[in-house]
Regions:
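Short, surface-exposed loop/turn segments at secondary-structure boundaries that line and modulate
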Residues: 257
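N-terminal Rossmann-like or analogous alpha/beta NTP/dinucleotide-binding catalytic cores
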Residues: 1-119, 216-230, 276
């Protein structure tokens, strides 16, 4: 994501991607996930390319400074809107997705009610008020030009578990997703969930490496892959980078505000050789990697 701050966690994940790809004669590619326009910064793509290049992680294909290289483009999600919209339309036609015209105020009111009732937060069950609305209501809102998002119609239940084998965490059980998540925002751009599924299928992604903080989204992604009739890639959820807090003595996540060593620029400024940084990260990932 071109948000302007390249940190050690980015390099940590990319290092696994690169090694897995090249050790298996695969492809290490750069896809720019720029669907969150509010957080995007000018020159963000260049920062990503420069940062990884400085640590000896060149991309085989994908987005470049002045375009792209490879046969699976566009590699910028902001340029793939029509692709996503085509697949969303297919889900709507099959009754697996629907438009939702809820306002922010209505969603906030539902959230407050859920909090009051000590219920799970989100858009599901009786709170999914547009899930089964008659076509006349939908057509009336469309005629008025009311903004809407498109939601996936989940058939999951939190009473059920999914068995899954993660490449890092091994065999595990996760709770099914029962939320009717947004897959297309009101500006016609997909959410991360849907863009990830479509792109990983079309680009032939076989392994997705990401931090364990994304583990909670796994049921949504597996559900979307099944709905599309596609084989899901393998997932590897890596542990988050931690440090011992000098003040409390306890473990905590690295922080932009507190820890200058989180920024990739820190290591060149302090004179750390690139091989030493990579060796450190590889040892964290697998203590006997040699």
């Amino acid at each position: 994501s071109p948000t302007g701050f390249m940190h050690l966690g980015n390099l940590y994940g990319a290092l696994v991607d690169e090694r897995l790809a090249h050790q298996s004669k695969g492809v290490f590619y750069l896809r720019i996930e720029d669907t969150d326009r509010k957080r995007e910064v000018e020159g963000g793509v260049q920062m990503i390319i420069d940062a990884f290049k400085s640590f000896g992680l060149p991309f085989d294909e994908g987005a470049t400074t002045d375009g792209e290289t490879g046969i699976y483009g566009p590699y910028r999600q902001s340029q793939r809107a029509e692709i996503y919209q085509t697949f969303v339309k297919s889900l709507v036609q099959r009754g697996m997705a629907y438009p939702c015209f809820c306002t922010e105020e209505e969603l906030s009111a539902a959230h407050e009610q859920q909090e009051k009732n000590k219920e799970n937060f989100g858009y599901y069950g009786k709170y999914a008020v547009w899930r089964d609305r008659p076509m006349e209501d939908i057509e009336a809102e469309l005629a008025k030009g009311t903004p809407y998002v498109v939601r996936f119609r989940s058939e999951g239940s939190i009473e059920h578990k999914i068995r899954h084998e993660d490449l890092v965490k091994g065999k595990m059980e996760v709770t099914e997703n029962d939320q009717d998540v947004v897959i297309l925002k009101s500006d016609g751009i997909p959410t991360y969930h849907f863009a990830h599924v479509v792109d990983d299928h079309l680009m032939g992604t076989t392994v997705v490496v990401r931090g364990e903080e994304w583990l909670a989204t796994l049921p949504v992604h597996l559900q979307l892959f099944r709905a599309m009739g596609w084989k899901a890639p393998k997932y590897a959820h890596t542990a988050q980078l931690m440090k011992i807090d000098p003040e409390t003595g306890g473990k905590r996540k690295l922080s932009k505000r507190k820890d200058p060593e989180l920024a990739l620029t820190f290591y060149a400024q302090e004179g750390y050789p690139v091989p030493a940084v990579l060796e450190y990260l590889m040892t964290l990932l697998n203590s006997n990697f040699e």
